UniProtKB/Swiss-Prot annotation:
The keyword Ribonucleoprotein applies. Belongs to the bacterial ribosomal protein bL33 family. This is Large ribosomal subunit protein bL33c. InterPro entries: Ribosomal_bL33, Ribosomal_bL33_CS, Ribosomal_bL33_sf, Ribosomal_zn-bd. It comes from the Eukaryota. It is found in: Plastid, Chloroplast. GO terms for cellular component: chloroplast; ribonucleoprotein complex; ribosome. GO terms for molecular function: structural constituent of ribosome. Keywords: Chloroplast, Plastid, Ribonucleoprotein, Ribosomal protein. One of its GO terms (biological process) is translation. The keyword Membrane does not apply.
C-alpha cells in the first residue's frame, strides 16, 4: 500500500563554476557540466550541493541542485 508521495525525487546538479563564469560568454569552457541523481526529500529538504568532477573545468567543483 502506498503511503502518499514518494520520498525520493530526481534532481539535477549543475557546476557552479561554469554557470558563474558564463560558459558561452567568456569561451573559457565549452559547456556546463550536469549530473542527474536522486535525493531523499525527508532527509535533505534543502538544496543539494556535492563536489563532483567537471570535465569542462578539468577539476572537482561544487555542483548545486537546480530547478527543473
Amino acid at each position: 500500500m502506498a503511503k502518499g508521495k514518494d520520498a525520493r525525487v530526481r534532481v539535477i546538479l549543475e557546476c557552479t563554476s561554469c554557470t558563474r563564469n558564463g560558459a558561452n560568454a567568456k569561451k573559457e569552457s565549452p559547456g556546463i557540466s550536469r549530473y542527474i541523481t536522486e535525493k531523499n526529500r525527508h532527509n535533505t529538504p534543502s538544496r543539494l550541493e556535492l563536489k563532483k568532477f567537471c570535465p569542462y573545468c578539468s577539476k572537482h567543483m561544487i555542483h548545486a541542485e537546480i530547478k527543473k
